[in-house]
Amino acid sequence: MLGDEKEGTSAIPGFNQIQFEGFYRFIDQGLIEELAKFPKIEDIDHEIEFQLFVETYQLVEPLIKERDAVYESLTYSSELYVSAGLIWKTSRNMQEQRIFIGNIPLMNSLGTSIVNGIYRIVINQILQSPGIYYQSELDHNGISVYTGTIISDWGGRLELEIDKKARIWARVSRKQKISILVLSSAMGLNLREILENVCYPEIFLSFLTDKEKKKIGSKENAILEFYQQFSCVGGDPIFSESLCKELQKKFFHQRCELGRIGRRNINWRLNLNIPQNNIFLLPRDVLAAADHLIGMKFGMGTLDDMNHLKNKRIRSVADLLQDQLGLALARLENVVKGTISGAIRHKLIPTPQNLVTSTPLTTTYESFFGLHPLSQVLDRTNPLTQIVHGRKLSYLGPGGLTGRTANFRIRDIHPSHYGRICPIDTSEGINVGLIGSLSIHARIGDWGSLESPFYELFEKSKKARIRMLFLSPSQDEYYMIAAGNSLALNRGIQEEQAVPARYRQEFLTIAWEEVHLRSIFPFQYFSIGASLIPFIEHNDANRALMSSNMQRQAVPLSRSEKCIVGTGLERQVALDSGVPAIAEHEGKILYTDTEKIVFSGNGDTLSIPLIMYQRSNKNTCMHQKPQVRRGKCIKKGQILADGAATVGGELALGKNILVAYMPWEGYNFEDAVLISECLVYGDIYTSFHIRKYEIQTHVTTQGPERITKEIPHLEGRLLRNLDKNGIVMLGSWVETGDILVGKLTPQVAKESSYAPEDRLLRAILGIQVSTSKETCLKLPIGGRGRVIDVRWVQKKGGSSYNPEIIRVYISQKREIKVGDKVAGRHGNKGIISKILPRQDMPYLQDGRPVDMVFNPLGVPSRMNVGQIFECSLGLAGSLLDRHYRIAPFDERYEQEASRKLVFSELYEASKQTANPWVFEPEYPGKSRIFDGRTGDPFEQPVIIGKPYILKLIHQVDDKIHGRSSGHYALVTQQPLRGRSKQGGQRVGEMEVWALEGFGVAHILQEMLTYKSDHIRARQEVLGTTIIGGTIPKPEDAPESFRLLVRELRSLALELNHFLVSEKNFQINRKEV
C-alpha cells in the first residue's frame, strides 16, 4: 500500500499481493526455519553423524517454461539443493557434499502453481487463534458455568472449569476431568510452589482433601493419577519412563504446544511476561489461567467473543507450505536413519548423497497440491474469476469447521469484519458464511491477523495532517472510526455536522472533532466482485451476493465490449489477472501477428508470444488479440494485446444492449427473458468453447495397444478425418460419433470364435492369429466442432506405468439459444424463453427495436433498484458517447445524488440528440414504445435503457439431454442417473404423488413398469409398437418391488402378494 502523508492519497494494492507475499515469506523465512529444525542424525554406536548446513541452500531456476509444463502435464518446480556433511567421530573427518533434496512447486505471475499440468491455487484459511478463551454457559439448573479453554497451535484443547463450590477442574477428555492441583503437580510443581504462585491460595486450599494430598504427594503419584484419568486405565499402573513418554506424546505435545502466536496471546490475556521463544504451556500459565477463572466467577474480567477476528488467525500459503516441508523433512529423517543403519550392517561406506533421496519432499508436495482441501484447481472461467479465487478465505479444511457442524453465529457478519472480510461476497448453499472473500485493502499481518488501513486525523498548529495506519482487529476497538460512506467533500460543512462512527463494535453519532480515524476508500469494505457492481448501495445485500457470484460465471464473448456504467476498478482487475499482455519497458514495435509481438527496447529485441485459442479448465476460450501496430512507439505498462474478456486493458465480461422492462405475452413470466434474433445473427452473445478429449495407450498382458487408421468393422465415413497414423487431422470438422483417434487393443480369442481358415493356419503352420478389440476415441454427443490442436504426449521411459497420452482439442462456436442463462450485475438473472424476429420486438420512437425484454415484477420484490439507475444512465451514455465510472455511496455528497445524476444525464442526452422521448418530465426515465407486431403504442410508458448484460456458463448445450435406449442398473434394473452416463427418467416417491394427484393411473403404471424396471414388459413393448398391437398389461411385479421383498427376506420378514380378480374377487397367490 502506498501512502502519501501530505495528500492523504493511496493506491489500491495488487490483487494477487496476498498470494505473492505468502509465497515470498515461505521462501525467505519458512524454508530456512524448517531446514534449521532438521536434527543431527547419529548411528547406534555414535560413530557417524549426519547434518544439514542450512546457510548454503539453493533453489535452481526451472528447466521448463510454464506453457510447456501445462501441455506436457509436468510440474513447474524448482530443485532444492542443500549442503550436507557426514562426520566420522573416531577419525574426526568430515565429508561435505551438495545434495538434491527434492522439487518445490513455484508460484507463477498469476499467484498459482502448475502441478502435473494443472493450475492450482492455495487459499487462505481462518482458524481459531491459539491462546486462552473464557466463556460462560448455563447448566440444566440455569446457573452460569465458567470455563477457560486453552487452544494449542495444533488445535488441541484443554478446558479449565470452575464448579459451584469454586473447585477448579481440568477436563482431559469428554468424560474425564482431574483437579487443577493434580495437573500442576504432574507438570512439576509441589503444593508450596502452587500456593505461592496463585492470587487466591485460600480457594485452592478449600478443596485440598486428604485424598487430594495423597495424589499430589509426589510428582510420580500425580503423573500416575493423571495417566489413569486420561487413558481411562483401571487397576494400579506402575510409574515408568515409557508411561511418561506416552503421556508426553499423546497429551502435552498435542494440547500444550502454543506456538509463537499462542504464547503472545496468552501473555497478553493473562498479563504475563514469559519469553516469546517459550512456546509450550508452563505450570505458571495454568495457574494464572485458574486465577483468571476464579476472577470471572466473582464478576471480574470480561468474557471472550470467539467470533471476533482478534481471536482468529489466517493460515496463509506460507504456513501451509511450511507445514508440508516439516512433514517431508520428518520423513526424510526416517529414511536417512534407516539408510545409515543399513550401510553399517552391510559394512558399506555411506556418503551424504547416498543417504538422501528426493522422494519424500517431491511426493509430499505433489500429494499436498493434489489432495489437500485448501489446494484447489484454479477457476479460469474469466479474468475476474482467476483474481477472486486467490483472495478467498475458508473456515473449512483441516483443523477448521465443516458445513454440517458450523452454527449460524459463525456464519454471520461480525462488526470486526469491517474493512477486512467482505460482508457481501460469500458462497451460496451449505457453505454460506464459511467461505468469504478478502476486502480490497485488507492484508495479512505478521501474526496472522487481518489488517485494514485507516487515515489518522490529528491537528498540529491548526494544520490538518493525515497519516495512514494499518490496524489489526484488536487495535481498532480503541479508536473512534468515522464511516467512509458519510464524509462530505466540503471540510467546512464536515466540521459542523455530527458524523456516524464506530467504537468498540457499536455505531454512534459523534462530533467531527472526536473522530480519531476515518476510512480511506468507499470500496474498502467490499471484495473485488462486490466492488464491480455500480449503484450497489441501492441493492439488497442478497442480490449483491448473487451478482458478485454470477460475474465470476460470465463467459468471455467473441467480441467483448466495455461497460458504459462501471465503478472504476475494471482496469486494475484486468491488469492484475495477467490476461492482457503488457509492455515491461518502453520500446518500438518491430513486428506483430496473431502469434507474437516483437519489439526493441533497452538495446534488446524481445519476442512476446501470444496465447492462441487456449482452453481454460471451464472449457472457455483464452485468446489474446494484438492492440499495437508495427512501427509504433510504446511506453512501459502499455497494453500490447487484449485477452479474453478485456478491451483496452479493462474488464469486459458482457454487452451493453437495449432493454425494456415490460411483460410480453407471458414469455417473461418468472424471470424468463425475451430476446431479439439480432443477438443471434449479429454474434452479439457468441462465445467460443474448447473441449479436450484424451486417450491413453497401455501395454496389456496380451501386448501393447496400437494407434492405427486400419480399424476393421467400422464404416469409412467415421474414419474420414484420420491421418495415416490414425489421429484426427488439424482443421477437420467432426460430428458426434466420429473417430478422433483409432486404437486397437489386443485380446485372446476363444478357440470356438476362430474362423475355419484361421484354425487351418494354426494346425498346419502353427501361426497364432491375434484378434484385436476396437477401443477408439469417439466424439460424444454434443461435441461437434473444429479440431484446433492435437497433442501426443510421450512420457520419458515409456513403461506401462507411464502411458502415452493423445489429446484432441475441439473448438465450438455457440450462439445464444433458448435455455441459456443471462444476468445483469444486480442479481437479476433469467433464462431465455423465446427468440423473436426483430420486426416483432417492441421498438422505440426512433424506430430502433429493443434487444431484450425483462420482467418489471423482478425489481420491486427483490429490492435491486440499482439496475434501474444503471439502465437509464447506460442509455444516456450510449447517446452521448460517454462512459461513467461511479464510486458507491454517492449519497455522502448529497441526498438523491444517484437519481439527480441519472436525470441530468438523460436530460442532456435528450437536448443534444434532439429526441424529447429520452427524457419526458411526466415520467422521467420512461418512454412510450410501440408493439412491433401491430405498430400500436403500449398502454403504459416503459423503462428503457442500456444495462450491461452477461452470458453465463450455464448453457443449454451442456445441460439438455434425451434418451431413447440405454443402460440399466444391475440391481434395481432402473435407468442410470445423469447426463454423463446417458441416463434416463427415474420416477421417485414425490413424482408418483404428483401423478396420483392428477389421477393419471395409466401413465403412472407405464412409468413404474414398461418405462422403468419391468424387464419382460419393456422387452414386449418394442415388438407390439412395431406391429401396431396393444401393449399387454404386465402380469407380475416390477424389479424394484422384488428387490424390496428380497431385502425384507434378508431381515427374516416374508412378504407375499396376491392378485384379486375384479369379477369374482378370487384371490390368486403369486410368487415374487
Curated annotation (Swiss-Prot):
It catalyses: RNA(n) + a ribonucleoside 5'-triphosphate = RNA(n+1) + diphosphate. One of its GO terms (biological process) is DNA-templated transcription elongation. CDD domains: RNA_pol_B_RPB2. GO terms for cellular component: chloroplast; chloroplast nucleoid; DNA-directed RNA polymerase complex; mitochondrion. Pfam families: RNA_pol_Rpb2_2, RNA_pol_Rpb2_3, RNA_pol_Rpb2_6, RNA_pol_Rpb2_7. Its main location: plastid. Its EC number is 2.7.7.6. GO terms for molecular function: DNA binding; DNA-directed RNA polymerase activity; mRNA binding; ribonucleoside binding. It is found in: Plastid, Chloroplast. Keywords: Chloroplast, DNA-directed RNA polymerase, Nucleotidyltransferase, Plastid, Transcription, Transferase. DNA-dependent RNA polymerase catalyzes the transcription of DNA into RNA using the four ribonucleoside triphosphates as substrates. HAMAP family: RNApol_bact_RpoB (MF_01321). Belongs to the RNA polymerase beta chain family. In plastids the minimal PEP RNA polymerase catalytic core is composed of four subunits: alpha, beta, beta', and beta''. When a (nuclear-encoded) sigma factor is associated with the core the holoenzyme is formed, which can initiate transcription. This is DNA-directed RNA polymerase subunit beta. It comes from Arabidopsis thaliana. The lineage of its organism: Eukaryota, Viridiplantae, Streptophyta, Embryophyta, Tracheophyta.
